[in-house]
Amino acid sequence: MQKKSNSLRDVIVVGFALFSMFFGAGNVVFPPYLGMEAGPQWLAGFSAYFIADIGLALLGMFALLRVGSSEAVISRVGKVPAELLMCAIILCIGPMVAIPRTSATTFEMAISPNLSGVSPVLFSVLFFALILVLCIKESAVVDIVGKILTPLLLLGLFAIIIKGVITPVGEISALPQISNVAVTGIKAGYQTMDALAALPFGIIVLQSVTAKGYDNSKKQFRVVGGSAILAGVLLLAVYMGLAYLGATVSGQYNGAIGRAQLVMAIVEALMGKVGMILFGVVVGLACVTTAIALTSSAAAYFAELCRGKVPYKAFVIAICVFSAVVSNLGLDRIVAVAAPVLDVIYPPTLVLIFISLLMPRMPDRVSRGACIGALITSVLCTLTAHGVNIPVVPSLPLYDLGLSWLIPAAVFGLAASLLPLRARSREKRIVPLPNEEH
C-alpha cells in the first residue's frame, strides 16, 4: 500500500517537472497567436498544434522508454548522420533558437511594456551574464526558484484563462485570417520544439526515476509513462485555454501584432496593468530558469561530444555569447528564422521516433532509407514554401496537411528493405529492447 502511495507521488512530482520542461515560458506565445489567426476555426488549428507539439513529444518519450536511450533512437541512421542530427537538435533547443528566445521573450513581455527606455542590447548582455554565472556555478538556488515559479506561472495562467472564458475580451471573428489552419497549427507545434526536446528530456526523467529506486524497466515505464500523460493533460488544458483567448481577440488584432505583444494585450485587458506587470515578471523569471536548464544541457552535450577536449565552462561561455547576439533579432524574427530549419529536421526525427516506438526491431537500412526520403521531401517542401518553384512538390500526397514527407519516407524505407542480400549482410545491429525477458 505504501509502495503504491509512493508511486503515485512520484508520478505527480515527475509529471509536474516534465510539464515545466516542456512548457518553458517561451511557449506561452504560440497558442494565443494561432487562436487569433484561426478565429472561428481555432479548435481545428489547436488540434493540429497539439498533435504536432505534445502528441509528438509524448510519442518521443514512449519511444525512448521502448528502446532505452536516445542513442538507440537516433543511431539507426549511422554514427556520423546520428551525431549531425543530434547536434542540429541540440542547437535548435539551445543557442540557435530556444535559448535566445528566452531572452527575447523576457524583454518583450517583462521589460519593454514596463521600462520602455531599456536597450534590448544592454538587456541581453545582462540577461546572459546572469545565465553565465548561474550555469558555471550550478547554483542550487535555480532549482528552488524553478520549483516556486512553475506553480506560480501555472496558477497565473489558469487565472487568466478562467477569467477570459467567463468574461471574454471580445468576440471571435467570422472568418479565419489564414487559409490553412491545420498546416499553420502543425508549424506552430514545430516551433515549440517539444518533440525534439523529448529525447534529451526523456533521458533526464529516466535518470531521475531510476535514482528513486525504479530499476525495473516495467516500473520505469509505468512511472515515466504516467508522468508523461499527466504533463500532457496539463499542457492540453493550458494551451487550449490560451488558444481560445487568442480566438476571442481575432476581431481586434491581426498578423501585424507581435506574438508577445498579443499575449500582454490579452493579459492587460483581463487583469489590468498590475496583472500585466506581475505576469511579465513571473514569465521573465521562468524564462531565466529555462535558459539555465537549456544552456547547461547544451554545454554538457557538446563537452561530452568533444570527449573533454573543450571544457564545459568554455561551452557555457560560447553559448551565452552566441545566444545574446541572436536574441537581439527579436522574438518574431527568431521564430521566422527557425521555421525552415525546424521544417527540415523534424520529419527525419519523427521517422526515427515512430520506428523506435512501433517497429524497434526494424533493420537499420530501412530506418536510413525512410529518413532519407523524409529529409529529401522536407528540404524540397521548405524550398517551395520560401519561393523556389518546384512544380511536383504541391502535388505530393498530404501536402495540404504539411505531412507530404510521410509517403516518401515509407517508399524509401520499403526500397531499402529490398536491397540485395550482400548489402543486407553488412547490417551489424538490431536494437535489443530493454524490457525483453532474457
Predicted regions and their residues:
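Hydrophobic, membrane-embedded alpha-helices of multi-pass small-molecule transporters
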Residues: V13-F23, I161-V169, I178-L245, L278-C287, ...
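Helix-loop-helix connectors at the membrane interface of multi-pass transporters/channels
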Residues: L34, T102-S119, T210-A211, A291-A318
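Membrane helical hairpin/interfacial module
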Residues: G35-A129, I136-K137
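Membrane-water interface regions at transmembrane-helix termini and the short interhelical loops
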Residues: M36, L65-A72, F128-L149, A211-Y214, ...
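Selective recognition of specific alpha-helical transmembrane segments in multi-pass small-molecule
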Residues: G55, L59, L152-K163, G226-S250, ...
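TM-loop-TM module centered on a large, flexible mid-protein loop between adjacent transmembrane helices
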Residues: S70-S75, V238-V288, E304, P340-L342
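Membrane-interface loop-to-helix entry segments
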Residues: I136-G164, A338-L350, G369-L375
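C-terminal membrane-solvent junction of multi-pass transporters and transport-like membrane proteins
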Residues: L350-L414, S425-H438
